[in-house]
Structures are given as structure tokens and as C-alpha cells.
Amino acid sequence: MSKLILAINAGSSSLKFQLIRMPEEELVTKGLVERIGLKDSIFTIEVDGEKVKTVQDIKDHVEAVDIMLDAFKKHNIINDINDIDGTGHRVVHGGEKFPESAAITDEVEKEIEELSELAPLHNPANLMGIRAFRKLLPNIPHVAIFDTAFHQTMPEKAYLYSLPYHYYKDYGIRKYGFHGTSHKFVSQRAAEMLDKPIEDLRIISCHIGNGASIAAIDGGKSIDTSMGFTPLAGVTMGTRSGNIDPALIPFIMEKTGKTAEQVLEILNKESGLLGLSGTSSDLRDLSEEAESGKARSQMALDVFASKIHKYIGSYAARMHGVDVIVFTAGIGENSVEIRAKVLEGLEFMGVYWDPKKNENLQRGKEGFINYPHSPVKVVVIPTDEESMIARDVMTYGGLK
């Protein structure tokens, strides 16, 4: 018997939703509420492939959910709100408390709130969505799916920082990692495409979008990942610096007179591709600029690819080899150029990739880009975090 599951991603003033029929993983509709709590909020829903947009004031997330449910009935997507069988909520930080997704109870809600100090921008916003759905749909299971949960299998040697140990014990300072739902989805899909048990595979997953992280997945479990205590760590990103020498922060403060908060803002929002190029955080813009001879744009692309390339080598060493390299997310799925730069020179590791196949895979296409004889397979997989969320609602919401 099919179930209708809502996959939800709530921001402080936004609410993204997808209604998915399970277990078929068929998208029924999707949409977005923007500018919640502001004047002229925008509600967009997809009906028969067309976007239907309305502008009205929406005061809070409860009203946003109410409007969404009304739209479902108005457009005959559902007959009654009781047709919805469960909801799944993306929650950015689950800390060490949540090594897997969890059915939401009052206790779980309280624990998500307590973890807000680890994700002050995201967890409170995710909670707004959870509370709105629990209020309006009280009789169905609601499940929290944590970005950090997949990486809770990392061993101590991967997640501990070389700081006084009591900082970890007292304040929870350690590597947590993010994009877990995406890494989990593409690693499972890669195993399906290879027709091999995931337990037998060593996978390096490259989630490369405006935010980017690399994960080492051994036997289906994350054993290391590039992001850290926050999503600022790791590789160069659209506007984030990735790893830097921590002593740079007081040095920049001294040289510029900026506060620690201001420097952190620069590292999060003015660095990465944007900071290096001085023009854009968008890879497409930088590729065009590089082609027209802008040296700084080319340099930004080279730095970006080089950091990812380095992590692949590092994680191959961590797993004593690699069987599959996966590219996913906006840049990973679409940038022929970045994939080529990242893979360049990896033949010593058994990576032999086909430039023609690489050229053909973009705009949501899935497939292998390695030569048949390549010991290491290279695959492009469009990520689908919403389907992963819906799967977890079925499992943890007791709907299977």
C-alpha cells in the first residue's frame, strides 16, 4: 500500500517541501514558501509540471503549512489532510545524541533545541518547521533526519581534534561532518549501479555544490569527512574558505581591526571562490571569465579542484584503496571541467576516466565516466536527499 510522505527543509523564513509517494519514490508535487514573517511572502507549488505562484503575507511557519495543505486540496493533489502518512524534517545538527534518524517526540524536540548551540542558524529554524507540522498534523509520524548522523560512525582518530581532550568532553568540540543524507544516498545508489553489496565497497563521495564536502565511506559507513565542527571546514567552497591555519584569525584581526565575529563572517561569506576570484562564487561565471583570459578566475578554479583532488588521495590512503569515486550536487553533477581537473593525475591510483563520457554527463544525468578497464569506477549521481528523507520516514516512522 502506497504512502504519501512530505520531505521538509525549513529555514528561518522559508519552507521547502516535496510530497513523495512511497515506496515508489515518485514525486507528486514540490514547492517553496519564501519570506515567511515578512511582507509579500511568496508561495510556489508545482501543479502538472507548471509552477503556480501566489503572493500574500504569511506570518509564521504554522500559517505556511496551513496554506500548503490548502493548496494540496485545492489542486486535487490530496482529498483530505489525512491522506498524508508522515513527514520527514531535515535537521542540520544531531550532535552525538543522534547517530541515526529519529521519530520526533517532545523529548527529541527538546534535544534538537539543546543542540542549537552547535548550529545556531539552522536548528532553531528546522524546529519551527517541526513544530508547525506537529501542531497541524498531530496524528501521523514525524521523523528528524540529521545532516550529521551518517558521519557518527567515524572513529575517534578521525573525529578528534588535537586539542586538550577536556574541550571535547566539556564542550563537544570535535569533527561532526555534514551533507550526510546526500553522502548516504549516493553511496547506496553507487552500490546498486555496480550491483555489488555496499559492505564490499570503498567509496569516496564528492558532494560539490556551493557548499562542498568529501566523505570516505568504507563498507557503507562514513569513516572520515572533510567538513568539521562546522560546515566551514574542508575544501574551498563558493563563499567559504575551507581549512585555514587558525592563527590567521588573530593575525587578520590585528591587521584589519576587525572583531572575531567579523573575521568569521568573511571566512563564511566572502572567501572561497568569491574571495579568490574577486568576482563571483558561481562556478559557471568563473569558467566563462577564465576562458576569456581572467587569470584570477582560472586560479580560483585551480585552487578549488586541487583541494578536492588532495582529499581523494588522502581518503584512498585512509581506506587502503578505493573502488568508486562519486561526484554529486550542483557542480559535481554538471561541471565537466571540475571533474576533469579533480581526476587529473589519479592514474597511479587506478583511475582511468573517459573524457567523452565525462563530457556527456551533465544536467541531471547519471552514469559512469571511467573506461571499462579502470580498476576504480567513477560515477556521476544526481543527489536526492528528499528520497532519502522519505525512506527514513518509512523506516523510523513505522510505516513499512
UniProtKB/Swiss-Prot annotation:
It is found in: Cytoplasm. The keyword Oxidoreductase does not apply. Pathway: Metabolic intermediate biosynthesis; acetyl-CoA biosynthesis; acetyl-CoA from acetate: step 1/2. The keyword Transferase applies. ATP binds at residues 16, 207-211, 282-284, 330-334. Keywords: ATP-binding, Cytoplasm, Kinase, Magnesium, Metal-binding, Nucleotide-binding, Transferase. The active site is at 147 (proton donor/acceptor). Catalyzes the formation of acetyl phosphate from acetate and ATP. Can also catalyze the reverse reaction. Homodimer. Belongs to the acetokinase family. This is Acetate kinase.
